[in-house]
Regions:
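Polyanion-binding surfaces on beta-sheet-dominated domains and ring/shell assemblies
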Residues: 1-152
Length: 152
């Protein structure tokens, strides 16, 4: 058997990872997956392929806004690949204290970094309650700077 390269590991994990949207948002009436759901589905694959994952987070102020950056790194011990995602932090968010605001931004950034690294589709599920609602086609007047016709 040939030794898998780093990219082979990542490609196999991307293909085998199943992280279903098992959470439900009652307010928006849609299913979603959390960062924890992704990590739970990922652990057996990391073990199978002898890889490890690290997640580090940093905060910085950009143009007067607090921004949290989540960096997800996968490694086989020799080579590493990483992806970063950012989320704004609103310390004055209604109904949340500062720790909850940071936690919410952390979860969001982590989820999207994981999703980008492992190519997870984050569109709404096919069983979403809004799947059969008609979608309005954009009109040229709704698209500033558009000069032409739309063919659909």
């Amino acid at each position: 058997m040939t030794k898998l390269t780093k990219m082979d590991y990542l490609v196999n994990i991307q293909n085998e990872l199943k992280a279903p949207k098992n959470q439900f948002n009652n307010f928006g009436k849609y299913k979603y997956r959390s960062a924890e759901d992704i990590l739970e589905a990922l652990k057996p694959l990391l073990l199978k392929y002898g890889c490890y994952l690290t997640i580090t987070e940093t905060t910085q102020e950009i143009a007067g806004y607090l921004v949290l950056t989540s960096k997800v790194t996968i490694s086989d011990g020799d080579k590493t690949i990483f992806v970063e995602a950012q989320a704004g932090i609103n310390p004055e968010r209604k109904g949340m204290d500062i720790a909850q605001s940071f936690g919410s931004s952390s979860s969001y950034a982590k989820k999207y970094a994981l999703g980008n690294l492992f190519l997870l589709d984050d569109t709404k599920d096919a069983d979403s309650s809004k799947v059969n609602e008609p979608v309005a086609k954009p009109k040229p007047k709704d698209m500033p700077g558009f000069k032409g016709t739309l063919n659909a």
